[in-house]
């Protein structure tokens, strides 16, 4: 009886119509220009992530991006001796997505934040956190572009 139940479940789950979305099929656009405004390192990392994901030169949909980042660093945590133990980084990104064919402009605001520990490896911790936050921002921008074009 257990075998029959498992067999029936497998049959229904395999034929439910669920299909994974293949992002590579959705990438029918090319970024012709990325204009950056503020933080050079973060802007460069976002540009590299997007260019790596969107390298379809033969796509008919050409888009231009204008990216403006604001980075705020603040104290997140102190210990009993009032010494700083953690910092918080907020990255607020405003993106204009401009479609070349129609000159349609879409606005996108993204806010991400994270904390890193203060100490001997502070520079490495900060850089690693910034890289992680930039990947999140790039993924959100990419998803927004895919949803808008489809």
Can you say where each PLM-predicted feature lies in the sequence?
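Short extracytoplasmic
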Residues: 38-53
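Short amphipathic
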Residues: 30-37, 110-113
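Surface-exposed short loop/turn segments
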Residues: 51-53, 57-58, 62, 67-109, ...
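Sec-dependent signal peptide recognition
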Residues: 1-9
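Bacterial Sec signal peptide processing site at the extreme N-terminus
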Residues: 10-33
């Amino acid at each position: 009886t257990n075998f029959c139940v498992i067999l029936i479940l497998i049959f229904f789950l395999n034929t439910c119509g669920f299909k994974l979305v293949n992002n590579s099929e959705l990438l029918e656009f090319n970024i012709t220009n990325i204009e950056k405004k503020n933080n050079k390192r973060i802007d460069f990392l976002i540009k590299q992530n997007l260019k790596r994901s969107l390298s379809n030169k033969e796509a008919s949909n050409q888009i231009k991006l204008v990216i403006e980042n604001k980075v705020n660093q603040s104290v997140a945590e102190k210990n009993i001796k009032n010494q700083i133990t953690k910092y918080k980084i907020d990255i607020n990104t405003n993106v204009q997505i401009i479609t070349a064919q129609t000159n349609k402009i879409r606005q996108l605001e993204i806010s991400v934040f994270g904390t890193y520990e203060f100490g001997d490896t502070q520079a490495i911790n900060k850089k690693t956190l910034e890289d992680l936050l930039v990947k999140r921002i790039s993924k959100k921008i990419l998803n927004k572009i895919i949803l808008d074009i489809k």
